[in-house]
Amino acid sequence: MNAITMPDIIGYNRRRFLRNMANTVAAAGFATVAFADDESDMNTTTMATAKPGSHTSFRSLKQIDAGVLNIGYVEDGPADGPVVILLHGWPYDIYSYVDVAPVLAAAGYRVIVPYVRGYGTTTFLSSEAMRNGQPSAVALDTIALMDALKIPKAVIAGFDWGARTGCIIAALWPERCKALVSVSGYLIGGQAAGRKPLPPQAELQWWYQFYFATERGRAGYDKYRHDFAKLIWKIASPKWNFDDATFERSAASLDNPDHVAIAIHNYRWRLDLAEGEPKYDDWEKRLAEAPVINVPTITMEGDANGAPHPDAAAYAKKFSGRYAHRLITGGIGHNLPQEAPQSFADAVKEVDSYS
């Protein structure tokens, strides 16, 4: 009898997960057209508004090989429209943009919403690849996706990990970023910054990062990943009364077999408790210098964001191009695009007009 190797296990888990995701996708209605198909509707901006929770599905789910990954993504809007890429964070997924995408598509944008590595149907092409959560590695996934889709330049918008990726692309590859929308502002950092202790109240907000630094934390997150994610959602958005169906649509993406490894590596790497890959060293050195972002930018913040986030006044000077900051009121928390989709879509359209 042949010995079972780690690649065998990874391959089995990957196949099983993809089968389960396919069933989830079908149940969620990806194959159902949730947006207006009429061309006149697609070109009408005055009729398109985004009410939180008004959509529960996307037009379609696609897959494409890009860099080290096979990336799952949804796409809507005219194929020849200006491109906007919407990037989700942890522990969320593409459904953060389920109400944003139709508004932008109706305004004429080609909207791309990818699953980040370790989420949904995005998987590694090689079972031997390091499950790396370094910020530069995650950002380069988006560059690889743009290359695979032959997108030379796009408006990039995101929150949480997605905002960090947007900031990194705008700073290191400004020729690929037409404009930026970043929830919680300038999120570029490095391991040196992660080694510096913060005041106790600030450290308390990062409790999960310290939990993940332990093997107990890794095991606990793996065992209770849905419960853990729901807790984070509630802490980060204390006034958002999301229902179980809304949560479970996104939580299914966390069952990706690479999810725990990538999330744990990301937070350990930030504290300099895990090594990265040498091929990213030069990029991380540049990011550690906190480069200024020159592309047109709108930063956003919800008035009830319960997640750790910097003060807007502290990072405004990091944006040297045309810049605006928007505080969104009404009890809006960390998952701003899902909680205030119209405000987020408006910011994308506004920042696009800056360039």
Could you describe each region identified by the protein language model?
Residues 332-340:
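Catalytic histidine-centered segment of alpha/beta-hydrolase-like enzymes
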Residues 21, 142, 344, 348:
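Hydrophobic "lid"/C-terminal helical patch
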Residues 41, 46-58, 68-71, 76, ...:
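Flexible "cap/lid" subdomain of the alpha/beta-hydrolase fold that forms the substrate-access gate
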